[in-house]
């Protein structure tokens, strides 16, 4: 098992998330591994392979979007607060980006809720609507990098040029930083703390890890499209189009 940890070793000022919460992925190789029979669930039942994979589609992609909702919420909250600190909240282009971020978050939330509401019960287990949850995951994944761009644009270049914790603690530098980096209604330190939070989510190795997760975790974009294609009942729409066009339904 080869482990890959994401998030630099650092302090909670510069890395407010990864300094406290590590994300770990592994490359796991099973080479001549003995599996106890009580842990063997399929043994030649090839007809069950499809339903097993489908269960991944229905449940795992539901969790995929569900656990991303707090992330898109912090995009909205951090961007709004940073716009206040930067003194640009009244700018039309900033409000435009904030409205798009809000829409992104709420569409992801609404589609996830609807997938739960449209669940079917199988053997006493609620199964999310596969079509709707794949649409939710597809929307989240295909718009994630654009959302990052909106957040970065509102925050500004201090995401990568901001001072370190050591700089802020230096008596000779602290006065200059307080003078030039303080914001409307905010101290320089608080503004930098918020900037570092946004940087951690949009401009670090941890952010890159999250961006790859958005595309590939719990199923790739093409896998989601394939599921939507297979799950959607297009026949009623085809019949409706025929009726409006005056085409006989043979």
Residue ranges and their predicted role:
Residues 1-67, 229-250:
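FAD-binding core of flavoproteins
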Residues 23, 65-68, 72, 105, ...:
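Generic structural signal for well-ordered, non-membrane alpha-helical segments
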Residues 63-121:
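Extended amphipathic alpha-helical segments enriched in small hydrophobics
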Residues 108, 124-129:
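Active-site-proximal binding-pocket segments
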């Amino acid at each position: 098992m080869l482990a890959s940890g994401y998030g630099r070793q650092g302090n909670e000022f510069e890395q407010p998330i990864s300094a406290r919460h590590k994300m770990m992925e592994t490359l796991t190789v099973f080479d001549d591994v003995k599996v106890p029979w009580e842990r063997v669930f399929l043994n030649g039942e090839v007809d069950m392979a499809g339903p097993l994979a489908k269960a991944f589609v229905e449940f795992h992609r539901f969790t995929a979007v569900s656990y991303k909702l707090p992330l898109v919420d912090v995009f909205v909250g951090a961007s709004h607060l940073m716009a206040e600190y930067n003194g640009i909240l009244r700018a039309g282009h900033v409000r435009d980006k904030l409205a798009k971020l809000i829409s992104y978050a709420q569409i992801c939330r609404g589609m996830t809720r609807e997938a739960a509401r449209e669940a079917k019960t199988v053997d006493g287990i609620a199964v999310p609507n596969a079509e709707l949850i794949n649409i939710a995951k597809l929307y989240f994944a295909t718009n994630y990098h654009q959302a990052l761009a909106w957040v970065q644009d509102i925050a500004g270049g201090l995401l990568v040029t901001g001072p370190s914790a050591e700089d802020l603690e230096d008596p000779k530098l602290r006065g200059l930083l307080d003078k030039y980096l303080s914001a409307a209604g905010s101290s320089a330190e608080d503004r930098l703390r918020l900037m570092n939070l946004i940087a951690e989510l949009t401009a670090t190795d941890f952010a890159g890890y999250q961006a790859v997760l958005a595309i590939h975790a719990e199923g790739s974009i093409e896998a989601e499209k394939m599921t939507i294609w297979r799950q959607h009942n297009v026949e009623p729409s085809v019949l409706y189009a025929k009726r409006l066009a005056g085409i006989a339904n043979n």
